[in-house]
């Protein structure tokens, strides 16, 4: 679970949105997003997909199954 939080934080810091902006974009609360980033709660599959879409990375990258963030066409 920690890998998801680490990846979320890295992506957020690279792209510069606030936690609130991300949460609003994927229709979750800011507190929920913070918990995902801190690794204290695991996001649902729907939320993981929304986050991967938001950051334009593959779901495999977000969950740690790949080190390549690119999405396959």
Which sequence ranges carry the predicted segments?
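Short, charged recognition helix plus adjacent turn
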Residues: 2, 63-73
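Short basic helix-loop element that most often maps to the first helix and adjoining turn
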Residues: 6-25, 50
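Short, basic-rich loop-to-helix N-cap that marks the start of a DNA-contacting helix
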Residues: 40-50, 71
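Short amphipathic helical patch at the helix-1/turn junction of helix-turn-helix
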Residues: 2, 13-14, 42
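Recognition helix of helix-turn-helix/homeodomain-like DNA-binding domains
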Residues: 27-42
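Conserved hydrophobic/aromatic packing and binding residues within compact polymer-binding modules
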Residues: 8, 22-23, 33-36, 62
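DNA major-groove recognition helix of helix-turn-helix
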Residues: 37, 55, 66
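DNA major-groove recognition helix of helix-turn-helix/homeodomain DNA-binding modules
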Residues: 27, 46-61
